[in-house]
């Protein structure tokens, strides 16, 4: 009797580039609205759903196949964030009726606070990935600080501006991170540097 065990390994590509591209696109479009360059949310919602949510969820699922807990948690956490935010916008716009359009913005502020906590400990993890990702997470921290405070009505104009410019910064660095992930792998060398891990917590 043959007792040999066979292991089948299914290889899949690194999904980080697509996940970061999704993040870059949704934050670029959303920041344009926060900065007052564009108005309304109707054309922000599709990008929130398909790029912010679905693209990052795809990256989350595929990172889990790579046994990448950090990537799975990061992409999954923010994918569900954009799903929830897009749904919240639809409620507020009255898509589901006038009664559901009557909302308490402070509930959303508490959600932003929860995501601020999430982002802070994920920032610690990003320190041991690479420096571009660390910068993205620091900007995400500032985004959620701004969103939390402005939604609570604390120094509303200043904190809204903090959120807006932080979100634009996230878009810029995420485009770079996505490009680096694609091109470095494609060319088999460091085409766009992303910086080494800090080496503080993980030796």
List each language-model region with its residue ranges.
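Short juxtamembrane and helix-loop transition motifs at transmembrane-helix boundaries
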Residues: 3-12, 31-42, 68-71, 92-104, ...
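Alpha-helical membrane segments in multi-pass integral membrane proteins
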Residues: 109-121, 131-152, 159-180
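C-terminal ends of transmembrane helices
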Residues: 56-66, 120-128
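Short, highly charged, low-complexity non-transmembrane loops/tails of multi-pass membrane proteins
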Residues: 188-203
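Structural signature of hydrophobic alpha-helical transmembrane segments
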Residues: 40-52, 100-114, 137, 165-168
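N-terminal topogenic module of multi-pass integral membrane proteins
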Residues: 1-59, 63, 198-201
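Cytoplasmic-side transmembrane-helix entry/capping segments in multi-pass membrane proteins
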Residues: 69-78, 133-138
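Core segments of alpha-helical transmembrane spans in multipass integral membrane proteins
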Residues: 22-29, 46-58, 72-90, 109-121
């Amino acid at each position: 009797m043959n007792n040999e065990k066979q292991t089948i390994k299914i290889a899949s590509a690194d999904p980080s580039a697509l996940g970061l591209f999704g993040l870059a696109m949704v934050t670029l479009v959303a920041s344009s609205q926060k900065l007052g360059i564009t108005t309304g949310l109707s054309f922000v919602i599709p990008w929130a759903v398909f790029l912010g949510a679905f693209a990052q969820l795809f990256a989350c699922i595929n990172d889990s196949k790579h046994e990448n807990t950090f990537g799975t948690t990061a992409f999954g956490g923010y994918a569900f964030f954009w799903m929830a935010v897009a749904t919240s916008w639809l409620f507020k716009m009255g898509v589901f009726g006038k009664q559901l359009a009557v909302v308490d913005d402070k509930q959303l502020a508490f959600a932003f606070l929860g995501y601020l906590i999430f982002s802070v400990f994920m920032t610690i993890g990003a320190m041991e990935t690479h420096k571009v990702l660390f910068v993205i997470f620091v900007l995400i921290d500032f985004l959620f600080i701004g969103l939390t405070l402005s939604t609570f009505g604390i120094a509303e104009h200043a904190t809204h501006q903090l959120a807006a410019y932080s979100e634009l910064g996230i878009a810029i660095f995420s485009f770079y991170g996505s490009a680096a992930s694609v091109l470095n792998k494609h060319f088999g060398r460091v085409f766009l540097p992303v910086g080494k891990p800090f080496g503080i917590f993980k030796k």
